[in-house]
């Protein structure tokens, strides 16, 4: 935002520009993957940590709204437990690390309610929820549907 503030000669023009922009938000992948595994697991239960991440996302989205942003596409987190890095790093059985996917699902389950709450409380805002978890899950479960 600092760069944008310098580009516009006054705050009203910046606010108008931001109100016409679409913001793509992808949040919490690193937090729910390696960061939780290495650092946060000792400090928080996954329920508490997921709520903490949602609270932080809420603050950041409200801050963007205050600056003038009105249109948001907010994606949830993909099934991190199926990513090659996680699969090759963490001992597990099955094709994916289900403990991590359950962790991601806890966070993802909280996201739609947050977006509905924000849209109803922030006048003129539009929040669209992108379910990339479902998209990735479909690719992992039916790779043949996407080519040979």
Question: Locations of the language-model features?
Answer:
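Mobile gating loops/cap/lid regions near enzyme active sites that modulate substrate access
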Residues: 79-98, 113, 117-120, 124-148
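A short acidic, glycine-rich active-site loop
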Residues: 45-52, 95-105
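Oxyanion-hole/transition-state-stabilizing segment in secreted/luminal serine hydrolases
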Residues: 2-51, 63-66, 70-89
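A structural motif corresponding to the C-terminal end of an alpha-helix
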Residues: 59-71, 107-127
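Extended low-complexity acidic/polar segments
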Residues: 40, 51, 55-56, 145-147
